[in-house]
Each structure stands twice: as C-alpha cells, then as structure tokens.
Amino acid sequence: MQVYDISQELFGSVVFPGNPVPAHRALKRMEDGQAANLSEISLCTHNGTHVDAPRHFVSDGRTIDRMDLNRLVGPCSVIAFEGLLTASDAARLISGRQQRILWKGDMAFGVDAAREFVRAGVLLVGVESQTVGTDDCRADVHRTCAAPVNLGGLEGAPCRAVLIRP
C-alpha cells in the first residue's frame, strides 16, 4: 500500500480574497526551558485543504460535525481535466467511475455540472487548483480519506487529504 498526501501545507496555501491568512505562534518552547513545545494557530475554516459542509452554502444545511464520514473515505477516481467542466463533460467523464471523484488540474464547474454529480450519485467532489495527486500517482482508481477536523456547529473544517493505492 502507498499513501500520497494531497493536502496543501496550510501556512503556505493560497487564501481566498478577503479571508484571514492562517497564522501560528509559539506559546511554549523547549529551547526556552519549557517542558514541551506548544503552539497556537488561527485560521479560517476554509483555508488550505478543507471540507465544505452543506451549511457553507445552505443556511439550514448540515454542519461539519453532522456529516457522514463514509462519504469522505473510500474508493475514488482521479480524473484529469482543465478548464470549465460542463454538465455534458461531467456526465461523460464520471460515467462508470467511483462515487468519489478527485479532479486533477486547474478546473471549475457550475450549477449544471453539480446537478449532474447529484444525478449520478457522486458522494464527494474534490478539487484543488494546483493538483490532486502527484506525478507518480497516475492510476485511475485509489482510495481516499479526507476526514475533517470535528468542529461542532461549523460550516467547514481543515482536513488532511490522502490518496491510498492498495
């Protein structure tokens, strides 16, 4: 089994305009005579690699702590695509694939493509503007784990996303 980390490093990740920049500071340092190192972080729930809960765009949607983790862990397909994904592109590319789709490349999709994902029973759509996976990780079917931090009542949370080649 090989595990590939597909997460962005949080403090070096691109920040959406207007969102706070993630930061950290040392509270305790062993080099200063403390018994342990201890840090404090501040971040937006949508900085870096993260999971959006339905609450992010639906006022009464489920919060991150109420999401079914089974949707975020399991077999997935990695599909390379560049540009704007249309509904017909989505239907063609996801046909016969796993229910979890990770898109590799600089891509975006609109409402019609999102509706096609729902119609096809897609459980997870992963997008990263830089890449999903690494150059040596080109096999089409993997397993993925993108479990979010359990932040009760919030609309999103950071996660450590990985691809697993059995």
Please describe what each predicted stretch is.
Residues 1-166:
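Active-/binding-site microenvironments in catalytic and ligand-binding cores
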